[in-house]
């Protein structure tokens, strides 16, 4: 059996998950048209065509997304593509980290769509019957297999490879801090780890405000010692800490865009906000204060962000309109220095970003209880 595999990136993923300097000289064509071109080109040479996609909305960096419907991103682009392609048997989707317990079959074309929630939490199993004499692919069954990695023995070959690199770079095992309880990510809400990282960035830069996209936080901190390797796992990117001057009105626009949740909520330090997620997009902010005082529209403030965000990553174009005050220190180095200074980490409290609609839900819950 010969299987043709076509890989494709979505337009939104191209523009909003790659820093602008990485896209220099590149253009992106319509993904469906491109896949159809290559499917037609290889159709006569294979028995089956599989498309691997990197599209739909950006994945939430949260390992419990299967049990948290609020962060599940859907697979609209995969579904639309499946309905407009001819001669493609399967689409296996990525990027959104959405999951389907059983594959979906598009009623128009019969194309099978499978997604596995991402981050190695599940394996996807699909079974097909293929008639090699004539072009005929029949879907038999498909399902997800949970990966309980903590219960599995280590693969010796992989462990040896990792440990050999640790020997080459012993500094990775340096203990740079200690935390008494886990610091966990949340994609659509403020998180303890997000508050900690932005506090440290604000301190390192000496800025009024720090802002970090939730998608940049790629791991949690477990309770106990924190090593340099774990810090790199949490923030694995090689960009510079960038401080930008923005007006109060521009900061409000920044926060309003964050509250539309296109790529999760922005994690913040230096600001306290109240918002209503049930209101229209770009009209959700109710109150915003800086160090307890009202943010002034015409006043200038310093805002520290990653180099990725400073270049408009994740759609934060407002950050490209500010005046760059500094961008000469690697982001990872800034975090490392702050961890080394603090050693024993104080768990940041929550409450910087209060969604009043959540308060209303809680109030209604208790008012209707049968105590």
Where in this protein do the model-derived segments appear?
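Acidic, metal/ion-coordinating pockets
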Residues: 1-150, 157, 188-200, 210, ...
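Basic, gly/Ser/Thr/Pro-rich low-complexity segments located predominantly at protein N termini
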Residues: 9-15, 98-99, 140, 168-175, ...
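Generic signal for short, ordered secondary-structure residues
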Residues: 14, 21, 70, 180, ...
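Feature captures C-terminal
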Residues: 104-112, 122, 195-371
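Hard-cation-handling environments
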Residues: 137-141, 145-226, 232
């Amino acid at each position: 059996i010969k299987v043709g595999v076509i890989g494709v990136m979505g337009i939104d993923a191209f523009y909003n998950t790659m820093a602008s300097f990485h896209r220099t000289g590149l253009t992106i064509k319509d993904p469906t048209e491109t896949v159809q071109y290559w499917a037609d080109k290889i159709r006569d040479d294979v028995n089956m065509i599989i498309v691997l996609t990197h599209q739909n909305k950006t994945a939430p960096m949260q390992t419990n997304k299967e049990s948290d419907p609020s962060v599940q991103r859907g697979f609209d682009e995969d579904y639309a593509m499946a309905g407009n392609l001819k001669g493609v048997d399967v689409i296996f989707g990525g990027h959104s980290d959405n999951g389907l317990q059983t594959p979906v079959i598009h009623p128009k074309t019969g194309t099978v769509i499978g997604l596995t929630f991402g981050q190695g939490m599940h394996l996807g199993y699909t079974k097909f019957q293929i008639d090699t004499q004539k072009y005929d692919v029949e879907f038999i069954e498909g399902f997800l297999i949970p990966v309980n990695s903590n219960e599995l023995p280590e693969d010796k070959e992989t462990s040896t490879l990792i440990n050999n690199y640790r020997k080459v770079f012993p500094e990775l095992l340096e203990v740079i801090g200690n935390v008494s309880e886990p610091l966990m990510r949340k994609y659509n809400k403020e998180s303890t780890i997000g508050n900690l990282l932005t506090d440290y960035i604000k301190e390192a830069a000496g800025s009024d405000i720090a802002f970090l996209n939730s998608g940049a936080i790629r791991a949690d901190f477990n309770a106990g010692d924190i090593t340099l390797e774990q810090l790199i796992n949490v923030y694995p990117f090689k960009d510079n800490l960038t401080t930008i001057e923005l007006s109060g009105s521009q900061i409000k626009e920044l926060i309003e865009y964050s509250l539309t949740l296109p790529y999760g909520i922005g994690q913040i330090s230096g600001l306290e906000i109240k918002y209503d997620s049930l209101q229209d997009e770009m009209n959700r902010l109710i109150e915003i204060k800086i160090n307890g005082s009202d943010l002034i529209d015409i006043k200038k403030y310093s805002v520290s962000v990653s180099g990725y965000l400073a270049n408009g990553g994740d759609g934060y174009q407002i950050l490209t309109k500010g005046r760059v005050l500094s961008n000469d220190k690697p982001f990872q180095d800034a975090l490392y220095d702050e961890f080394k200074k603090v050693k024993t980490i104080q768990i940041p409290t929550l409450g910087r970003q209060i969604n009043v609609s959540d308060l209303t839900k809680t109030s209604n819950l208790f008012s209707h209880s049968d105590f």
